[in-house]
Amino acid sequence: MLDLVIRHGTIVDGSGMGRYRADVGVADGRIVEIGRIRAPAQRSIDADGLIVAPGFIDGHTHMDAQVNWDRQGTCSCWHGVTTVIMGNCGFALAPCPPAEREWFARCLTAVEDIPLEAMLAGIDWKWETFPEYLATVEQLPKALNYGSYIGHSALRMYVMGKRALSEPATDDDIARMVQAVKQAVRAGAMGFSSSRAGTHVTPDDTPVASRIAEWREIDALVGAMAELDAGIFQVGPEVSSGPAQRAFLERLRQVALDTGRPVMFGTISTRQGEAPNSYRYQLDYLDQSIAAGARMFGQTTTKSINAIFALKSYLPFDALPHWKEVRALPVAEQKRRMADPAVRAQLVADEDRMKPRDKVFQGGGAATTDPRKPDYTNLFAMRDVEWNDPTVASLAAERGKHPVEVMLDLMLANEDQVFVQPLVNEGRDDVLDMLRHPWTLTTFSDSGAHVCQEMGSSLQTHMLSYWVRARQAFTLEQAVRKLTFDNAAAWELNDRGLVRKGFAADLVVFDEHTVRPTMPVVEADLPGGARRLVQKAEGIAGMIVNGKIAFENGVATGACAGQLLKGTGAA
């Protein structure tokens, strides 16, 4: 008897080839039959009229902390994702000496906007080394599959202590780090990650440890993986355009050519008004790198990356005197004060204290430390997930009110009102150009990070609803391949990403006509009551992970069949 049969579905198998109708039989966590299945099964799913596809794979997340308290793997799980890779950009929770645990947590808060109180309340910190961290993840109950990099900043701090934040590594330091990378890869690390991004800073506003490293150190650490013929090098790139970015990319190509290891960087993105637009240079660079013999990938997402503001999380004005006083109150009392004409006048007048807008990224958290006057022509009052929203500036002109008054009115009418400020990828045709490039990977949700600032976890359902259904820029078969097989191949997950006999039974069942993300809302559901943005999806009927039904119509079944996925160098 089979464990599970998905009957009457239309299979989009991840290869990019045409769809077909068939049943899928599952036993012992594997796909064992595809066709007209007559054998009985303990469970059956009727997928008539629905698509059956491989589970989606997200290679750029920061779920390192969240996996400790969230069995379901939200929000990724609601968008058809069955496998995530964490430890990106050099940020990880291991290796870490016990005395430095809070410092590591504070760094994740500073860089990735993961609330400190959630980490302190939600992590039962049982590990010190990276292999011990993997062993902990392996034992945790989890609905999804997890793989992880060993992170450069964590490794550097572990070996060098506070010297890691200001000094080049000595030969002895590098030798110790090389051994740790080899140990991690043998234990199952997907590879080694780092960051050179100027936006990545510590709680003291100094560069994270990986940004201090000289290239000879990076050469040695990626070279350690080359000696084992295993492991991927992922790096958060130099984000400025121009000579600095080009020098970084040229050096990165040399690492790929010298070591032969796969190298990933990103996200590749486009910024409105930037000339020349660096994303085009990066795509050309990928072509040149591949032609030279490098194994090189750029990561990109399917939509704009946004700062999201809401009454229940951050607002651009939170550091201003009268706003600070009001925002310290419970939401109901905030609304009462905001409705008071005298208080409203003070809140509006406070906006004049804000610094002029500049070209620096203005994410949600930055509102509390470095307030900049919003560009109301680029701040949207979100009404639906189709992104056809009015700007605050247009509403202010229409109503004859100050933009701050308009925002207050909208929040009083709906305390869940969300405002969206695109940071990059404002040009949708530019995004399409990136998605169509043969050496980009459709990933980079950043799930688990920026939990009150951004909402990238919906990229998979956005791909299906916007780029496939609304824009018809991809066939469903093409889009599913980008979310499944292409990512499985890049991360060397050799038994996932296709609906094939013998492959792991990671599957998603969805309605191609209705699948889409829902509106984001703010929930106080993190450990310690910390808040985050939550975005679910419609149109996903079921998700199977290693043969067990993990979700039915978006609701968790309680099954926790997720596994720790190990890299190809695992002993």
Name these PLM-found stretches:
Residues 433-440, 445, 457-459, 509-555, ...:
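C-terminal cap of metal-dependent C-N hydrolases
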Residues 11-23, 418-425, 429-431, 475-480, ...:
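Acidic, glycine-enriched loop/beta-strand segments at the rims
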Residues 133-137, 143-145, 149-156, 162, ...:
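Active-site neighborhoods of metal-dependent hydrolases
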